[in-house]
Regions:
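A glycine-rich, hydrophobic loop/mini-helix early in the fold
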Residues: 38-71
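Short, solvent-exposed loop/turn elements at beta->coil junctions and helix N-caps
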Residues: 27-31, 103-109
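Nudix hydrolase/Nudix homology domain
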Residues: 64-67, 77, 104, 111-181
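A short local loop/turn or secondary-structure capping micro-motif enriched for an aromatic residue
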Residues: 29-32, 59-64, 139
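Residue-level structural signal for beta-strand termini and adjacent loop
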Residues: 26, 57, 134-135
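Acidic, metal-coordinating catalytic segment for phosphate/diphosphate chemistry
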Residues: 1-42
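The catalytic Nudix box helix
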Residues: 53, 68-103
Length: 181
């Protein structure tokens, strides 16, 4: 028992104000739907005015087998949001010039979870960096392609909630910048 507890992911439990009030094993939290409020980080990747999305996989706890950002993770107990962003991005998180920028914090809730989502965005400027991010199950999506598929089960529940905000902020600004180039 003790060995399995050491390997367990420990998640902070938040109050409704977003303050840490304790911790719980991820496996226990998942067995009690929506009972605990946990922080997560998500990183949107934008390249040439398009969003890069990958398949979440069939075993994903929320929105399995749907398209979503390549970087997302729980914030572990006693870890900062910023360190979680770096860890989630792997070797890309080591380069300061590639660090994503914080965009918005919101509460995501469905029948299984309640999460405090910290959404970041990374605007990739070079093909070399994009090649390091690419995964076999990933694809660049235009805003139009996304709009045509919203609500059809193609995208994760998180993404469905975030897209309008992204479209009216970062993607809009990115398209203005592209037009001036």
């Amino acid at each position: 028992m003790q060995g399995s507890l050491r390997k367990e992911m420990w998640l902070p439990v938040l109050n409704d104000g977003g303050k840490v009030i304790g911790c719980i094993a991820r496996s226990v939290s998942r067995s009690l739907p929506k009972k605990y409020y946990h922080p997560v980080v998500r990183v949107a990747v934008i390249y040439q005015g398009m969003l890069y999305l990958v398949n979440r996989g069939k075993k994903a706890f929320v929105s399995p087998d749907t398209m979503d950002y390549p970087f997302h993770s729980y914030v572990l107990f006693r870890h900062s949001i910023e360190s979680t962003v770096r860890e989630t991005m792997g070797s890309l998180g080591e380069k300061e010039e590639l660090m994503p920028r914080f965009l918005i914090r919101y509460t995501f809730e469905n029948e299984r979870v309640k999460h405090l989502v910290n959404l970041y965005v990374m605007c990739v400027r070079s093909e070399e960096v994009m090649d390091r991010i690419k995964q076999p199950n990933g694809k660049l999506w235009t805003s139009r392609q996304i709009e045509e598929n919203l609500g059809s089960g193609v995208f994760s529940e998180y993404f469905e909630q975030e897209f309008a905000y992204l479209q009216n902020t970062v993607l809009l600004a990115e398209n203005f910048c592209k037009a001036d180039c």
